[in-house]
Structures are given as C-alpha cells and as structure tokens.
Amino acid sequence: MGAEPTAEREYVAEPDVGRLFSLDSLVRLSDALPSSYWRLDGVARALQDAATEDWEDCGIVTDALWLARRTSFRRVGPWPVIYDRLRLTTFCAGVGAAWAERRTNIYVGDQLVIEAASLWVPVDPRGFPVRIPATFHEIFGEAMKGRRVSGRVPVTLPPDGAARRPWPLRRADLDVIGHVNNAAVWQAVAEVFDAPVESVDVIHHGPVEEGHEVELVTSGDTMWLVVDGEVRVTASIVGDVVHDARR
C-alpha cells in the first residue's frame, strides 16, 4: 500500500528505478526577457513539451488528453539565461484516482537549476475527466514507488482593492478542446511576475475558454484570472531573486 495522499507541494527525488525520460532544449530568443533571463512562461512551455514527449514515447494508445491542474517549480541553482542548453528529466511521482503527478528536473550542463511538480488530469476529447488506464501503472508505476497524491488544490480569493484589468484572449491561446492552453495561461503570469523567482505555483480551478471575458487581478505576490466573478486560475510567487551568481 502507498502512503496517504499529500496536499502540500513536495519535490521528490529522481527515482533509482522505473521510467525516466529526458529531453534536450534551449532557452531561445522568443522565451527570454530583456534581462536575458528565461521567462516563466518559457519554463512552463518546456515542462509541457517534456510531458508531451514522454507521453507520446511511452507507447500507451488512447484518445485521452492531459490537462494541467497545478504546476509548481522552484529555483535550486542559477536561473537559466538565453542560449543556455537545457536537459529536462521527467518521471511520474504519484497518482490518485483520476490524476497523476509529474516531476521534472531542469539541468544546465550537469547542474540542477529548477525542480518542478505538476498535477495532471486525463480527459476525453470533449474535456470530461477519465480514469487512469491500467497500462499507465504498468509503464510508470515502478518510478512512483507506491506514492499517492491528492487532487485537492487550495483556493484563495482576491482581496478588496486588488488591481483589475481586462485580459483579452487570442485564438492562438486555444488548445484542441477549446481551452486556453496551459502555457498561454503562463503568459499572464509572466506579464505580472518577472523571472527569476525563488518559486512559483499556478493552480487551474476551472477552464478559461474561447469567448470568456477574463479579468487579470493582482495583489502583492498573487494574481488571479477571473471569469464572471469566478476565479479560474491562481498564481503566486515567493520572492524575486535579487542576487544571482550568473549575473
């Protein structure tokens, strides 16, 4: 039997058994700030690419898609800058009834610089949740080592007096089921928070879809995407990095 589900963010170590998948990448011009630092939405896009490549490579045949429910990452080394060559190593770190946690480590050379943990939910082509197939456990189960994770996510509401402005959606933001893509949501995060940061946590409480009139709400170290008064996305950071050995 696995451990009881955990609700807190935890960055478990890379397993010594089971499936690990690695992908090489680069901090490209399109993902770098004027300061040369890797933008937050660029990090999120790389994490999504690694997850997609791993899923396509694993051999499971299904029409299910995976949607991000929560993505967190923290800085553990110098923040990457433009043209840094990256290696992303990813693995499944635990499951629940209808969700799974993916851990990804990002390296520059041999140095671990960012640790990430993402909660993903499988859905059918219409966007409805489905259960994780048995073949998933056959391929990814050994690396999980019986760990169970909770699907619950915390909810915070904007305070009175928080700054508000429209956040127009573009057709380029939409994915194949009509939701605003995870990486596109992170563009709103990057609009509010510059990299580098010590850590960041983004939670999807509900979909943002074509036709929605979205408000971008900010207060201190937290931002929200709000539709018709309902929080759909929450993002929070822990402190800007003031001193970095690379700069």
Language-model region placement:
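HotDog/MaoC-like acyl-thioester-processing domains
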Residues: 2-7, 18, 72-157, 207-213, ...
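Acidic/His-leaning functional-site neighborhoods
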Residues: 161, 165-241
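Hot-dog-fold acyl-thioester-processing enzymes
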Residues: 2-70, 117, 122-198, 246-247
